[in-house]
Amino acid sequence: MNKVHKPLYFYLMLFFSTTIIGALLLYLPFTGKKPISFLDALFIASSAFTVTGLSPVDIESQFNILGEIVILLLIQIGGLGIVTVTLLTLVFLNRKISMKNRFLIMVTWNIDEPGGVIKLIKHLAIYSLVTELIGMICLCLSFIPKFGIGKGLFLSLFTSVSAFNNAGFAIFKNNLIDYSSDPIVIITISILIIFGGIGHFVVIDFINCKKLSKLSLHSKLVLTTTSILIIIGAITFFLLEQFNTMQHMGLVEKIGNSFFQSVTTRTAGFNSIDIASINKSTALMLMLLMFIGGAPLSAAGGIKITTFAVAFIFVLNYIRKENNVSVFNKEISDKHIKLSIVTINISFLFISIITFILSIINPNISLIKLLFEVVSAFGTVGLSMNLTTEYHGITKIIIIFVMLCGKVGLLTLLRTFIPPKNPKNYRYTKGQIYL
């Protein structure tokens, strides 16, 4: 086996084994209020560990407090990354971190250099826990008066962890629809999703930077693209849904929920309106946002906003016939341009193939609903048009596979199982192709 591939295989085995252990715990009688099939338990464990949020059952009515804690832990471990949690444990025990383990972190977070890996995971853990704690305290202001101290604290903790890790799991029957008019819940969760979706690197860079102009290119691209997508998404959602799913709301509430749905759609999957009732045009817009996702080095899914931004800038510069691809007075390398184009293409192809297969298996379900579910699973978002509870066996297995591919990354999987070619010492002559 190729030396480079050994850590990748280990990472995948660690990933899959954690999912199986989570499924077994959810399947056992002591974590549930009623029996559950192992496939449903596996689906929920996969959804929690990939921080997706899709579920074939109602979490509150299916699981007791122990089951909900298992889901909470899967979300937290999945958000931080199983490798990150493992290495944090080794650091806590004062164990030496080998180059193999450093390479695992590089694979998990798509880092090019092994230097500073330990510092990275320490900052990541502190940033995550502190932000989740602050979010929990804010949510307590709304949940404790309604549910009491005990349940209110747990609901606040669960929702804060779920929001920051962009999971979208909620221990409420209608997700957050009943809280669409609660500014504390809507604003707090929106902020948690944004901070979880842009990643700790950007936040630390922003805090340490005295001038915005001194921000790194990565931070500038993430913050700019995130802001643009949130604004465009909110305005579009408001225009398309103000007389549909939000017709019963006042103007301020419509604006707040439009902002919330724009934020949560790109990766978190909470919903304050009925997704099954949205217009087809809205569904298409949400699918685009889900496909793009959040930032690298974060809990977010999708192809990543930097991938989208680089590809968009490349196309724009190509149309303008500019030789170099640059943004914020920095040139983008050919390596990153190729990576962004490849990522978008294989992701689009993967989603198309999976949707085609599901359309054959589920001929009675409309194509746009199937496509919505696949994009949601691949982007580890968790929004659903109420189809998740209707999945039969083979469909659930396929969606589990899609969620895992979305979390691990298609390129990581392909590079793991497809051996690299040995570099050639020669080049062929160029041929003519008509496009």
Each language-model region and where it sits:
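Membrane-proximal intracellular helices of multi-pass ion channels
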Residues: 1-435
